């Protein structure tokens, strides 16, 4: 499930690319006094992913911008919505907005047999654990965290995002449902790396880390209902780590239903 937040700029501003920590703070202010307050910094995924404020670019007073929240927990999104309705000021650092409207969206990869492409809208964080490093012979970089890079090959990346998604499955799915590491088959059919880049990120007040991020296009074909659940969970809870800072948010950019050709999907003969 997704929540679209429609914003109106209150004054001119430069778009801040280092928005993550400030935006997370605004989310938690919307959750103040709710049952989710106790989950702040408890070490477990909240089950929330969110986009950047879009479109990018210099902000002028009166501009319309948007922001998307996604979560497998409908009550979490409902609580955020109520918090934003109570206090419509939406300030992220020097960027000052007011919440103009809220709308609900449903995103689904489709029934079994559906093919499509999921593209990451924000960078994916994959921090390799000591077990991953040992398994794949990756040397640690002094005391700094080891983030996935292309030279590590694709296998550690696949294993890491799958294990991360399993952790989210264990927290948010029904016990009777198999998780992504409980079944055979890849999460995605294709992994097209678009770019990698480093970004200084404030993870807590006074603590900034240089994080290595990657952006992707993932090809998928829905094998069965369990696989459909796993893909939708990735869309709702985010891919990889640091989702609470807005990383790993993704969108479906192509989708072809079973029995439908690419030409039909694109209305090529219209």
UniProtKB/Swiss-Prot annotation:
Keywords of this protein's UniProt record, alphabetized?
Antiviral defense, Endonuclease, Hydrolase, Nuclease, Plasmid, RNA-binding
Enzyme Commission number, as recorded: 3.1.-.-
Task: Identify the catalytic residues.
Answer: 41 (proton donor)
Please give the Gene Ontology molecular function terms for this protein. Answer: endonuclease activity; RNA binding
Q: Name one GO biological process term.
A: defense response to virus
Source domain of life: Archaea
Q: What class of enzyme is it?
A: hydrolase
Q: Where are the transmembrane segments?
A: none
Null mutant phenotype reads: Does not produce mature length crRNA; precursor is non-specifically degraded. No accumulation of the CRISPR leader-repeat transcript. Allows excision of defective provirus 1 from its chromosomal locus (detected as restoration of the attachment site attA).
To which protein family does this belong? Answer: Belongs to the CRISPR-associated protein Cas6/Cse3/CasE family.
Function field: CRISPR (clustered regularly interspaced short palindromic repeat) is an adaptive immune system that provides protection against mobile genetic elements (viruses, transposable elements and conjugative plasmids). CRISPR clusters contain sequences complementary to antecedent mobile elements and target invading nucleic acids. CRISPR clusters are transcribed and processed into CRISPR RNA (crRNA). This protein probably processes pre-crRNA into individual crRNA units, and also plays a role in generation or stability of the CRISPR leader-repeat transcript.
Tell me what else is known: There are 6 CRISPR RNA loci in this organism and a single cas gene locus. A CRISPR-Cas type I-B system.
User: Can you say what this protein is called?
Assistant: CRISPR-associated endoribonuclease Cas6
């Amino acid at each position: 499930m997704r929540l679209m937040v429609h914003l109106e700029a209150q004054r001119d501003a430069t778009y801040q690319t280092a928005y993550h920590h400030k935006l997370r703070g605004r989310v938690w202010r919307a959750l103040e006094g709710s049952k989710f307050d106790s989950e702040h910094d408890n070490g477990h995924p909240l089950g929330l992913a969110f986009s950047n404020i879009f479109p990018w670019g210099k902000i002028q007073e009166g501009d319309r911008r948007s922001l998307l929240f996604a979560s497998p927990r409908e009550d979490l999104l409902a609580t955020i919505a109520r918090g934003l309705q109570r206090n419509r000021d939406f300030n992220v650092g020097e960027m000052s907005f007011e919440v103009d409207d809220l709308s609900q969206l449903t995103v689904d990869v489709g029934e079994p047999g559906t093919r499509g492409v999921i593209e990451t809208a924000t960078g994916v964080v994959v921090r390799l654990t000591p077990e991953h490093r040992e398994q794949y012979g990756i040397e640690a970089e002094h005391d700094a965290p080891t983030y996935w890079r292309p030279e590590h090959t694709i296998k550690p990346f696949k294993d890491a995002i799958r294990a991360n998604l399993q952790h989210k499955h264990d927290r948010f799915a029904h016990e009777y449902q198999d998780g992504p590491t409980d079944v055979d088959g890849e999460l995605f059919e294709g992994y097209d790396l678009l770019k990698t880049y480093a970004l200084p990120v404030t993870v807590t007040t006074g603590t900034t880390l240089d994080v290595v991020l990657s952006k992707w296009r993932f090809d998928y074909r829905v094998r069965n209902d369990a696989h459909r659940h796993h893909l939708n969970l990735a869309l709702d809870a985010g891919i990889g780590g640091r989702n609470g800072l807005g990383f790993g948010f993704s969108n479906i950019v192509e989708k072809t239903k079973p029995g439908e050709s690419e030409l039909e999907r694109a209305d090529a003969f219209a």
